[in-house]
């Protein structure tokens, strides 16, 4: 999915605020995904799935850090996430259907925490960005 110049502007504007609290926002998105879609817990057999779990927060930070890194390479998201794509496809073998589920929950968390900044243009841009990241992360499955 091609990101327009306007999309890139909105992504660049909101990602630093998200990244500043990656453990909180990423953890909340993962927690929501685990509650709403329990089958996604399969890949985390040793996790404590309670709200504000340190394990979920730590993994949430990894997710947000990866998204922040991708946001610094909006013209080459595939290149910047190639190693992560390999990891998820070949080593972890994560169900590719989980990425859109997490993307949806990230949008929910961002909307809740940044209601003024999460206008329709930012919503569209972040949705396109997360869809692109999901596509990149599943590209090695084929």
Swiss-Prot record:
Keyword Heme: yes
Keywords noted in UniProt: Heme, Iron, Metal-binding, Oxygen transport, Transport
Domain Globin intervals: 2-142
GO molecular function, one term: peroxidase activity
Gene3D superfamilies per UniProt: Globins (1.10.490.10)
GO cellular component, one term: blood microparticle
SUPFAM superfamilies attached to this UniProt entry: Globin-like
Single GO biological process annotation from the record: hydrogen peroxide catabolic process
Tissues expressing this chain: Red blood cells.
Residues annotated for heme b binding in this entry: 88
Domain of life from the UniProt record: Eukaryota
One Pfam short name: Globin
Residues annotated for O2 binding in this entry: 59
InterPro entries the record matches: Globin (IPR000971), Globin-like_sf (IPR009050), Globin/Proto (IPR012292), Hemoglobin_a-typ (IPR002338), Hemoglobin_oxygen_transport (IPR050056)
PANTHER family recorded: HEMOGLOBIN FAMILY MEMBER, HEMOGLOBIN SUBUNIT ALPHA
Functional summary from the UniProt entry: Involved in oxygen transport from the lung to the various peripheral tissues.
Similarity annotation: Belongs to the globin family.
Subunit composition and interactions: Heterotetramer of two alpha chains and two beta chains.
This protein's name: Hemoglobin subunit alpha-1
Naturally occurring in which organism (per UniProt): Xenopus laevis
């Amino acid at each position: 999915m091609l990101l327009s110049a306007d999309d890139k502007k909105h992504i660049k504007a909101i990602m630093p605020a998200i990244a500043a609290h990656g453990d909180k926002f990423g953890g909340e998105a993962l927690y929501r995904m685990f509650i709403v879609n329990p089958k996604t817990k399969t890949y985390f057999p040793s996790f404590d799935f309670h709200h504000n779990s340190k394990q979920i927060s730590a993994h949430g930070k990894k997710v947000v850090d990866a998204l922040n890194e991708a946001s610094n390479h909006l013209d080459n998201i595939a290149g910047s996430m190639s190693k992560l794509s390999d990891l998820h496809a070949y080593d972890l073998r994560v169900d590719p259907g989980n990425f859109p589920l997490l993307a949806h929950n990230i949008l929910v968390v961002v909307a809740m925490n940044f209601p003024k900044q999460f206008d329709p243009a930012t919503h569209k841009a972040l949705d396109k960005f997360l869809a692109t990241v999901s596509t990149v992360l599943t590209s090695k499955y084929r």
